[in-house]
């Protein structure tokens, strides 16, 4: 009698993740010498696909996640090109076309030191309405991810809140919500109290942020304070790695779980998008670990390590420009 062939363990089904937010043109100006006002300086100008939400969605697809982006673009060539390129990258793009408004653009000025400054002209990206969302887009989701500035301007903010509601009503059991604080400027412009109350009402499972973004939201340098509005806080510290705080089943008054995950510093003249790659790596690694039966703390470790790997890959890779036309 022939012995049955050994069977390998079944692989977990790829996670379904929806990201809601910007898909824009990035116009990146990289100065070769210190920037001076009132004169020309040498450098490079590149046109890239941009938007934090789009960057996260693209990296999720690269990492094997069933990635979906819900965004708004203009009825123009830029919008068509951006959507087509992202679909080629494996993302299921649900693009709302906004008549009479052009696709958003972000100017990124990169100094020789690597310091970045941004000029945001988001245009159509902010004009998605709650009524534009189709409930079936949210069927079976394991997680919905939003950059905070998808919540801080109307009518996009109402669409973001509605998207979270639809995810919880139509997504998989135990669907999770992650929010990246994304940028200091929009948090301060919206008002830290209002921004904090809005994010808190959404009851996110995870908030990802830099230390400066935490301070902008809370008004103090206390990253663990994010646990007042989320179950997990992942603090991105660049070359210093990441610090994770989590609430668990500890008794009231006990300190939260806290651990650091180091990374290897990567020399890069332009770090644009590295934080988005980290978010995607964390989400993919965390959900994958949970699906494989790893406990909560172990899954957070694995997710954070995966975030570092994705960010390092991003920093070491050449940045693709949009094809001409």
Regions found by a protein language model. Give the residues of each.
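Glycine-rich phosphate/adenosyl-contacting loop at the front of the ribokinase-like
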Residues: 1-72, 77-84, 88, 106, ...
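Active-site metal-binding loops of divalent metal-dependent hydrolases
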Residues: 23, 149, 277
């Amino acid at each position: 009698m022939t012995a049955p062939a050994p069977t390998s363990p079944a692989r977990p089904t790829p996670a379904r993740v929806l990201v809601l937010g910007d898909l824009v043109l990035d116009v990146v100006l990289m100065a070769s010498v210190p920037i001076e006002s009132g004169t020309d300086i040498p450098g490079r100008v590149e046109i890239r696909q941009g938007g934090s939400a789009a960057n996260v969605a693209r990296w999720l697809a690269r990492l094997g996640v069933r990635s979906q982006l819900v965004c708004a673009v203009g009825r123009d060539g830029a919008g068509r090109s951006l959507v087509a390129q992202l679909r080629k990258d494996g993302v299921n793009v649900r693009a709302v076309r906004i008549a009479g408004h052009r696709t958003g653009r972000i100017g990124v000025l990169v100094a020789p030191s690597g310091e970045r400054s941004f000029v945001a002209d988001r245009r159509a990206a902010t004009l998605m309405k709650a009524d534009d969302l189709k409930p079936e887009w949210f069927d079976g989701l394991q997680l919905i991810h939003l950059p905070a500035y998808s919540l801080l301007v109307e009518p996009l903010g109402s669409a973001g809140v509605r998207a979270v509601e639809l995810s919880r009503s139509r997504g998989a059991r135990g669907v999770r919500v992650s929010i990246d604080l994304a940028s200091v400027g929009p948090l301060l412009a919206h008002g830290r109290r209002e921004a904090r109350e809005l994010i808190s009402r959404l009851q996110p499972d995870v908030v990802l942020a830099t230390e400066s973004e935490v301070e902008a939201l809370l008004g103090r340098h206390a990253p663990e304070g994010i646990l007042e509005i989320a179950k997990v806080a992942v603090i991105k510290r660049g070359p210093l790695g990441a610090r994770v705080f989590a609430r668990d089943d500890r008794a009231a008054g006990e300190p939260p779980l806290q651990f650091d995950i180091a990374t290897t510093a990567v020399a890069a003249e332009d770090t644009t998008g590295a934080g988005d790659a980290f978010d995607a790596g964390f989400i993919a690694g965390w959900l994958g670990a949970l699906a494989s039966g790893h406990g909560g703390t172990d899954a957070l470790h694995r997710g954070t390590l995966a975030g570092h790997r994705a960010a390092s890959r991003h920093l070491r890779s050449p940045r693709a420009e949009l094809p001409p036309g």
